[in-house]
Protein backbone atom coordinates (compact mmCIF):
# COMPACT_ATOMS: atom_id res chain seq x y z
CA UNK A 1 0.00 0.00 0.00
CA UNK A 2 1.16 3.54 -0.77
CA UNK A 3 0.68 6.11 1.98
CA UNK A 4 1.26 9.86 1.93
CA UNK A 5 1.98 11.61 5.24
CA UNK A 6 1.48 15.38 5.33
CA UNK A 7 3.64 17.48 7.64
CA UNK A 8 3.06 20.70 5.71
CA UNK A 9 2.14 22.83 8.73
CA UNK A 10 5.12 21.78 10.80
CA UNK A 11 7.00 24.72 12.29
CA UNK A 12 10.21 23.55 13.97
CA UNK A 13 10.27 24.06 17.75
CA UNK A 14 6.76 25.56 17.77
CA UNK A 15 4.39 22.60 18.02
CA UNK A 16 5.62 20.81 21.13
CA UNK A 17 4.40 17.24 21.45
CA UNK A 18 2.79 17.31 18.01
CA UNK A 19 6.17 17.93 16.41
CA UNK A 20 7.76 15.15 18.46
CA UNK A 21 4.99 12.83 17.32
CA UNK A 22 5.36 13.72 13.64
CA UNK A 23 9.13 13.32 13.63
CA UNK A 24 9.17 10.11 15.65
CA UNK A 25 6.35 8.52 13.66
CA UNK A 26 7.98 9.13 10.28
CA UNK A 27 11.43 8.14 11.52
CA UNK A 28 10.08 4.89 12.94
CA UNK A 29 8.00 4.07 9.86
CA UNK A 30 11.16 4.47 7.79
CA UNK A 31 12.67 1.67 9.88
CA UNK A 32 9.82 -0.73 10.62
CA UNK A 33 7.09 0.28 8.16
CA UNK A 34 5.76 -2.32 5.75
CA UNK A 35 4.10 0.08 3.28
CA UNK A 36 5.51 2.52 0.73
CA UNK A 37 5.61 6.04 2.20
CA UNK A 38 5.90 9.57 0.83
CA UNK A 39 6.09 12.49 3.26
CA UNK A 40 5.02 16.01 2.25
CA UNK A 41 7.23 18.48 4.11
CA UNK A 42 7.68 22.28 4.14
CA UNK A 43 11.08 23.59 3.11
CA UNK A 44 11.59 25.00 6.61
CA UNK A 45 11.43 21.43 8.00
CA UNK A 46 12.70 19.37 5.10
CA UNK A 47 14.48 16.98 7.49
CA UNK A 48 11.32 16.24 9.47
CA UNK A 49 10.44 12.94 7.82
CA UNK A 50 13.52 10.98 8.84
CA UNK A 51 14.33 8.39 6.21
CA UNK A 52 11.07 8.53 4.26
CA UNK A 53 10.87 9.63 0.64
CA UNK A 54 9.83 13.29 0.68
CA UNK A 55 8.13 15.88 -1.46
CA UNK A 56 9.26 19.37 -0.44
CA UNK A 57 6.84 22.29 -0.67
CA UNK A 58 7.94 25.93 -0.72
CA UNK A 59 7.83 27.54 2.70
CA UNK A 60 4.48 28.91 3.77
CA UNK A 61 3.38 30.82 6.87
CA UNK A 62 0.78 28.14 7.61
CA UNK A 63 1.96 27.43 11.12
CA UNK A 64 1.74 30.99 12.37
CA UNK A 65 -0.66 31.79 15.19
CA UNK A 66 -3.32 34.38 15.75
CA UNK A 67 -5.58 36.14 13.26
CA UNK A 68 -3.13 35.65 10.38
CA UNK A 69 -3.51 31.91 10.44
CA UNK A 70 -6.56 31.58 8.19
CA UNK A 71 -5.15 33.70 5.32
CA UNK A 72 -1.88 31.84 5.82
CA UNK A 73 -3.74 28.58 5.27
CA UNK A 74 -5.17 29.99 2.05
CA UNK A 75 -1.63 30.62 0.82
CA UNK A 76 -0.62 27.13 1.91
CA UNK A 77 -3.57 25.64 0.08
CA UNK A 78 -2.53 27.35 -3.13
CA UNK A 79 1.04 26.18 -2.81
CA UNK A 80 0.02 22.65 -1.87
CA UNK A 81 -1.67 22.40 -5.27
CA UNK A 82 1.84 22.23 -6.67
CA UNK A 83 2.20 18.74 -5.21
CA UNK A 84 -1.18 17.29 -6.08
CA UNK A 85 0.27 15.36 -8.98
CA UNK A 86 2.36 13.54 -6.38
CA UNK A 87 -0.87 12.20 -4.86
CA UNK A 88 -1.93 10.27 -7.94
CA UNK A 89 -0.02 7.11 -7.03
CA UNK A 90 -1.16 7.02 -3.37
CA UNK A 91 -3.86 4.93 -1.71
CA UNK A 92 -4.25 6.90 1.56
CA UNK A 93 -3.19 10.34 2.82
CA UNK A 94 -2.47 10.87 6.53
CA UNK A 95 -2.72 14.41 7.93
CA UNK A 96 -0.41 13.88 10.90
CA UNK A 97 -0.75 17.49 12.10
CA UNK A 98 -4.54 17.54 11.52
CA UNK A 99 -4.62 20.37 8.95
CA UNK A 100 -5.89 18.89 5.64
CA UNK A 101 -3.17 19.96 3.21
CA UNK A 102 -2.66 19.01 0.45
CA UNK A 103 -6.32 18.47 -0.34
CA UNK A 104 -7.29 15.21 -1.97
CA UNK A 105 -10.22 13.01 -2.93
CA UNK A 106 -8.35 9.96 -1.64
CA UNK A 107 -9.30 8.30 1.66
CA UNK A 108 -7.72 10.27 4.49
CA UNK A 109 -6.52 9.56 8.01
CA UNK A 110 -6.46 12.51 10.42
CA UNK A 111 -4.58 12.65 13.71
CA UNK A 112 -6.69 14.72 16.07
CA UNK A 113 -4.35 15.64 18.91
CA UNK A 114 -7.08 17.21 21.05
CA UNK A 115 -10.33 19.18 20.94
CA UNK A 116 -9.20 21.89 23.33
CA UNK A 117 -10.84 24.58 21.19
CA UNK A 118 -14.16 22.94 22.03
CA UNK A 119 -13.50 22.15 25.68
CA UNK A 120 -11.67 25.38 26.59
CA UNK A 121 -12.64 27.94 23.93
CA UNK A 122 -11.73 30.82 26.24
CA UNK A 123 -8.05 29.99 25.67
CA UNK A 124 -8.32 30.78 21.95
CA UNK A 125 -8.87 34.07 20.17
CA UNK A 126 -11.67 34.27 17.59
CA UNK A 127 -9.26 33.65 14.71
CA UNK A 128 -7.74 30.51 16.17
CA UNK A 129 -11.12 29.14 17.23
CA UNK A 130 -12.45 29.65 13.72
CA UNK A 131 -9.35 28.11 12.19
CA UNK A 132 -9.59 24.99 14.32
CA UNK A 133 -13.29 24.57 13.62
CA UNK A 134 -12.73 24.97 9.89
CA UNK A 135 -9.56 22.90 9.58
CA UNK A 136 -9.58 20.39 12.44
CA UNK A 137 -13.27 19.60 12.83
CA UNK A 138 -13.98 19.36 9.12
CA UNK A 139 -10.91 17.23 8.48
CA UNK A 140 -11.95 14.78 11.20
CA UNK A 141 -15.53 14.54 9.96
CA UNK A 142 -14.42 13.92 6.37
CA UNK A 143 -11.76 11.35 7.25
CA UNK A 144 -12.06 7.65 6.58
CA UNK A 145 -10.32 7.16 9.93
CA UNK A 146 -9.34 9.39 12.84
CA UNK A 147 -6.35 8.69 15.09
CA UNK A 148 -6.45 10.07 18.63
CA UNK A 149 -3.80 9.73 21.29
CA UNK A 150 -5.97 8.74 24.26
CA UNK A 151 -9.36 7.43 25.32
CA UNK A 152 -9.97 10.90 26.73
CA UNK A 153 -9.65 12.54 23.31
CA UNK A 154 -11.66 9.76 21.70
CA UNK A 155 -14.58 10.34 24.06
CA UNK A 156 -14.51 14.10 23.67
CA UNK A 157 -14.15 13.95 19.86
CA UNK A 158 -16.98 11.47 19.42
CA UNK A 159 -19.25 13.61 21.61
CA UNK A 160 -18.31 17.11 20.47
CA UNK A 161 -17.67 16.45 16.77
CA UNK A 162 -20.32 13.73 16.44
CA UNK A 163 -17.85 11.28 14.90
CA UNK A 164 -18.65 7.65 14.19
CA UNK A 165 -17.01 5.82 17.14
CA UNK A 166 -15.95 2.94 14.90
CA UNK A 167 -13.80 5.28 12.81
CA UNK A 168 -11.87 6.73 15.79
CA UNK A 169 -8.76 4.76 16.78
CA UNK A 170 -6.71 5.28 19.96
CA UNK A 171 -2.98 5.15 19.23
CA UNK A 172 -0.84 6.38 22.15
CA UNK A 173 2.43 8.20 21.61
CA UNK A 174 5.68 6.47 22.42
CA UNK A 175 8.92 7.18 24.23
CA UNK A 176 12.33 6.97 22.57
CA UNK A 177 14.04 4.76 25.13
CA UNK A 178 17.37 5.07 23.33
CA UNK A 179 17.36 8.73 24.40
CA UNK A 180 15.18 8.92 27.50
CA UNK A 181 16.80 6.55 29.98
CA UNK A 182 17.90 6.69 33.62
CA UNK A 183 21.37 7.79 34.63
CA UNK A 184 23.49 7.77 37.79
CA UNK A 185 23.08 11.49 38.51
CA UNK A 186 22.41 12.71 42.03
CA UNK A 187 19.04 14.38 42.51
CA UNK A 188 19.25 18.14 43.07
CA UNK A 189 16.82 20.49 44.85
CA UNK A 190 14.95 21.73 41.80
CA UNK A 191 11.63 20.92 40.20
CA UNK A 192 11.26 21.03 36.44
CA UNK A 193 8.47 22.09 34.10
CA UNK A 194 9.09 21.85 30.31
CA UNK A 195 6.31 23.73 28.51
CA UNK A 196 5.70 26.76 26.34
CA UNK A 197 3.65 29.44 28.17
CA UNK A 198 0.33 28.70 26.49
CA UNK A 199 -2.69 29.48 28.70
CA UNK A 200 -3.55 25.85 29.43
CA UNK A 201 -0.03 25.14 30.65
CA UNK A 202 -0.90 26.92 33.90
CA UNK A 203 2.48 28.49 34.69
CA UNK A 204 1.04 31.20 36.94
CA UNK A 205 -0.54 28.72 39.35
CA UNK A 206 2.64 26.63 39.42
CA UNK A 207 4.71 29.70 40.29
CA UNK A 208 2.22 30.53 43.05
CA UNK A 209 2.62 27.00 44.44
CA UNK A 210 6.39 27.27 44.20
CA UNK A 211 6.53 30.50 46.19
CA UNK A 212 4.64 28.73 48.98
CA UNK A 213 7.06 25.81 48.89
CA UNK A 214 9.99 28.21 49.18
CA UNK A 215 8.68 29.42 52.53
CA UNK A 216 9.76 26.11 54.09
CA UNK A 217 12.31 24.98 51.49
CA UNK A 218 14.39 28.08 50.68
CA UNK A 219 16.97 26.09 48.66
CA UNK A 220 14.34 24.74 46.26
CA UNK A 221 14.40 26.05 42.68
CA UNK A 222 11.96 25.89 39.80
CA UNK A 223 13.43 25.47 36.31
CA UNK A 224 11.28 26.23 33.28
CA UNK A 225 12.12 25.22 29.72
CA UNK A 226 10.42 26.00 26.43
CA UNK A 227 10.19 28.76 23.86
CA UNK A 228 8.43 32.04 24.59
CA UNK A 229 8.99 31.99 28.35
CA UNK A 230 10.00 35.65 28.32
CA UNK A 231 6.26 36.34 28.41
CA UNK A 232 6.34 35.30 32.06
CA UNK A 233 8.91 37.95 33.07
CA UNK A 234 9.59 39.13 35.69
CA UNK A 235 10.01 35.82 37.48
CA UNK A 236 10.17 35.59 41.28
CA UNK A 237 13.28 34.57 43.18
CA UNK A 238 14.15 30.92 42.73
CA UNK A 239 12.48 30.57 39.32
CA UNK A 240 14.78 30.30 36.30
CA UNK A 241 13.81 30.21 32.64
CA UNK A 242 16.21 28.23 30.47
CA UNK A 243 14.30 28.83 27.24
CA UNK A 244 14.37 26.23 24.50
CA UNK A 245 16.84 23.47 25.27
CA UNK A 246 18.19 20.50 23.33
CA UNK A 247 16.92 16.98 23.85
CA UNK A 248 20.25 16.11 25.48
CA UNK A 249 19.82 18.96 27.96
CA UNK A 250 16.26 18.01 28.88
CA UNK A 251 17.34 14.41 29.48
CA UNK A 252 20.10 15.66 31.80
CA UNK A 253 17.56 17.80 33.67
CA UNK A 254 15.12 14.89 34.04
CA UNK A 255 17.91 12.77 35.52
CA UNK A 256 18.81 15.41 38.11
CA UNK A 257 15.46 16.97 39.02
CA UNK A 258 13.84 16.27 42.37
CA UNK A 259 10.66 15.86 40.35
CA UNK A 260 8.85 16.85 37.18
CA UNK A 261 5.77 18.91 37.93
CA UNK A 262 3.16 19.00 35.18
CA UNK A 263 0.26 21.34 36.11
CA UNK A 264 -1.35 21.53 32.66
CA UNK A 265 -5.08 22.17 32.60
CA UNK A 266 -5.62 20.17 29.42
CA UNK A 267 -3.68 17.52 27.50
CA UNK A 268 -4.69 15.16 24.75
CA UNK A 269 -1.75 13.01 25.81
CA UNK A 270 1.16 14.72 27.56
CA UNK A 271 4.61 13.36 26.69
CA UNK A 272 6.82 15.04 29.34
CA UNK A 273 5.58 12.89 32.26
CA UNK A 274 6.41 9.69 30.36
CA UNK A 275 9.78 11.00 29.19
CA UNK A 276 10.61 12.01 32.76
CA UNK A 277 9.56 8.58 34.04
CA UNK A 278 11.79 6.92 31.45
CA UNK A 279 14.70 8.89 32.94
CA UNK A 280 13.84 7.80 36.47
CA UNK A 281 12.41 11.17 37.50
CA UNK A 282 9.49 11.25 39.99
CA UNK A 283 6.39 12.92 38.56
CA UNK A 284 3.64 15.10 40.05
CA UNK A 285 0.95 15.87 37.48
CA UNK A 286 -2.57 17.22 36.95
CA UNK A 287 -5.60 15.01 37.38
CA UNK A 288 -7.20 16.46 34.23
CA UNK A 289 -7.53 15.51 30.56
CA UNK A 290 -5.56 12.48 29.42
CA UNK A 291 -2.86 12.87 32.07
CA UNK A 292 -4.23 10.31 34.58
CA UNK A 293 -4.73 7.84 31.73
CA UNK A 294 -1.13 8.27 30.60
CA UNK A 295 0.50 8.28 34.04
CA UNK A 296 -1.49 5.48 35.64
CA UNK A 297 -0.41 4.95 39.26
CA UNK A 298 3.15 6.10 38.54
CA UNK A 299 2.62 9.78 39.44
CA UNK A 300 1.20 11.90 42.24
CA UNK A 301 -1.91 13.53 40.80
CA UNK A 302 -3.29 16.90 41.91
CA UNK A 303 -5.98 19.47 41.16
CA UNK A 304 -4.23 21.98 38.85
CA UNK A 305 -6.58 24.78 39.94
CA UNK A 306 -5.36 24.56 43.56
CA UNK A 307 -1.89 25.98 44.27
CA UNK A 308 -1.82 24.31 47.69
CA UNK A 309 -2.59 20.95 46.08
CA UNK A 310 0.26 21.44 43.60
CA UNK A 311 2.66 22.25 46.44
CA UNK A 312 1.52 19.24 48.46
CA UNK A 313 1.95 16.94 45.46
CA UNK A 314 5.52 18.13 44.92
CA UNK A 315 6.32 17.32 48.56
CA UNK A 316 4.67 13.91 48.27
CA UNK A 317 6.58 13.11 45.08
CA UNK A 318 9.81 13.96 46.87
CA UNK A 319 8.91 11.76 49.84
CA UNK A 320 7.97 8.85 47.55
CA UNK A 321 10.81 9.36 45.09
CA UNK A 322 12.19 5.79 45.19
CA UNK A 323 8.75 4.24 44.76
CA UNK A 324 7.79 6.64 41.97
CA UNK A 325 11.07 6.05 40.17
CA UNK A 326 10.40 2.31 39.95
CA UNK A 327 6.75 2.72 39.02
CA UNK A 328 7.64 5.37 36.47
CA UNK A 329 10.27 3.25 34.75
CA UNK A 330 7.77 0.40 34.47
CA UNK A 331 5.03 2.69 33.18
CA UNK A 332 7.23 4.36 30.55
CA UNK A 333 8.37 0.95 29.32
CA UNK A 334 4.80 0.31 28.13
CA UNK A 335 5.10 3.07 25.52
CA UNK A 336 7.33 2.76 22.46
CA UNK A 337 7.33 4.35 19.01
CA UNK A 338 7.54 1.01 17.18
CA UNK A 339 4.19 -0.02 18.62
CA UNK A 340 2.79 3.39 17.73
CA UNK A 341 4.01 3.05 14.14
CA UNK A 342 2.57 -0.45 13.71
CA UNK A 343 -0.81 0.68 15.04
CA UNK A 344 -0.76 3.51 12.50
CA UNK A 345 -0.20 0.98 9.74
CA UNK A 346 -3.29 -0.92 10.92
CA UNK A 347 -5.33 2.29 10.65
CA UNK A 348 -3.99 3.01 7.16
CA UNK A 349 -5.19 -0.41 6.00
CA UNK A 350 -8.60 0.16 7.59
CA UNK A 351 -8.91 3.59 5.95
CA UNK A 352 -7.96 2.29 2.51
CA UNK A 353 -10.71 -0.32 2.73
CA UNK A 354 -13.35 2.34 3.37
CA UNK A 355 -15.25 4.14 0.62
CA UNK A 356 -13.23 7.24 -0.34
CA UNK A 357 -14.26 10.33 1.59
CA UNK A 358 -11.26 12.64 1.62
CA UNK A 359 -11.14 16.41 1.52
CA UNK A 360 -12.55 17.60 -1.82
CA UNK A 361 -10.08 19.34 -4.07
CA UNK A 362 -10.72 22.74 -5.57
CA UNK A 363 -9.63 24.02 -8.94
Functional labels for PLM-detected ranges:
Residues 1-363:
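Carbohydrate transferase catalytic cores enriched for Leloir-type hexosyltransferases
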